[in-house]
Amino acid sequence: MTTEKINLLDFDRKGMRQFFADELGEKAFRADQVMKWIYHFGVDDFDNMTNINKKLREKLQHKCEIKAPTVAEAQHSSDGTIKWAMKVGDQDVETVYIPEDDRATLCVSSQVGCALECKFCSTAQQGFNRNLKVSEIIGQVWRAAREIGLQKETGRRPITNVVMMGMGEPLLNMKNLIPALEIMLDDLGFGLSKRRVTVSTSGVVSGLDQMTGKIDVALAISLHAPNDELRSQIMPINDRWDIQDFLASVRRYIASSNANRGKVTVEYVLLDHVNDDMDHARELAELMKDTPCKINLIPFNPYPGSPYKKPSNSRIDRFQKTLMQYEHTVTVRKTRGDDIDAACGQLVGDVIDRTKRTAALKAARGAETIDVKAV
């Protein structure tokens, strides 16, 4: 009988030290050394950890592994964006790398599919399959860094920013999200600034309250409507936590946060003649007056079968200017990677086909489910 090996990517620093002490009989500094090899140098072979003694390397090889998602497919956009389909077990998720002059952002998935059924998001077509493990979340960052080129090879950091805006709702996977974020921030991990790690949520108030005081990262909220009636139509989660409940939890989080500097980023997808009228803009401005924020307008990115359209540039411009009349800070997100379906709201692509092929098998095994109303 073969014993399943322990994936060290599933441990943050605290968990790694505990494992080394309890299972390997080793001191904390040895765990720290191994973490540094994994995340600073991208090493996944214990034999290459040259400052680890042979006896410990043999124990690690016998009991442990360093196993990140692998690249099943890579698509390169004309603007430099790269979309990877990354294999996690017998399923795939999508991870997007967005290079700019002053930063390199990685958009990371937290679930296979999504349970929230937002009407304008292509990932919702896939439905929910399962939560990703810690190793599958942080492993996307690890794999992307290897694909782009490690700092020791290129002289620059391969990834400067991480946004949890890929497939899935991060706050419905708190158990695995928090350790993954800890590794992103840890100096022995990727050592990212807390202001450069962003978690986006569609309004899981219980999860946001759980994060408050526990981990400090930048927060973005997917709002997309200025009133409950419209939001419930396009985002069913609003029936569980309405806008006022959501914004109250946002204010609690940013009050305890240094990463957000007192402001939250509000994401608002503009859907042609659905939520982009000037009355909607004025209503949104009034809604957000008591919640310090910057508003990021996202022109809808069409995908096959979607009933929605992108507004005209003139409607986008009028919506932005109306908000600015109320002294809000407003930006319009530049669309990146839309030619490879890597833009906001498009993350599903070929993954949906590969995932559906395993759905029946997963159902037969008793697939993981999330009841949003019960969260």
From Swiss-Prot:
Its cofactor is [4Fe-4S] cluster. [4Fe-4S] cluster binds at C114, C118, C121. It comes from Vibrio campbellii (strain ATCC BAA-1116). S-adenosyl-L-methionine binds at G168, E169, S200, S222, L223, H224, N301. The keyword tRNA processing applies. PROSITE patterns: RADICAL_SAM. GO terms for molecular function: 4 iron, 4 sulfur cluster binding; metal ion binding; rRNA (adenine(2503)-C2-)-methyltransferase activity; rRNA binding; tRNA (adenine(37)-C2)-methyltransferase activity; tRNA binding. Its EC number is 2.1.1.192. It is found in: Cytoplasm. This is Dual-specificity RNA methyltransferase RlmN. One of its GO terms (biological process) is tRNA methylation. It catalyses: adenosine(2503) in 23S rRNA + 2 reduced [2Fe-2S]-[ferredoxin] + 2 S-adenosyl-L-methionine = 2-methyladenosine(2503) in 23S rRNA + 5'-deoxyadenosine + L-methionine + 2 oxidized [2Fe-2S]-[ferredoxin] + S-adenosyl-L-homocysteine; adenosine(37) in tRNA + 2 reduced [2Fe-2S]-[ferredoxin] + 2 S-adenosyl-L-methionine = 2-methyladenosine(37) in tRNA + 5'-deoxyadenosine + L-methionine + 2 oxidized [2Fe-2S]-[ferredoxin] + S-adenosyl-L-homocysteine. The active site is at E94, C344. Binds 1 [4Fe-4S] cluster. The cluster is coordinated with 3 cysteines and an exchangeable S-adenosyl-L-methionine. Its main location: cytoplasm. Keywords: 4Fe-4S, Cytoplasm, Disulfide bond, Iron, Iron-sulfur, Metal-binding, Methyltransferase, rRNA processing, S-adenosyl-L-methionine, Transferase, tRNA processing. Reaction proceeds by a ping-pong mechanism involving intermediate methylation of a conserved cysteine residue. GO terms for cellular component: cytoplasm.
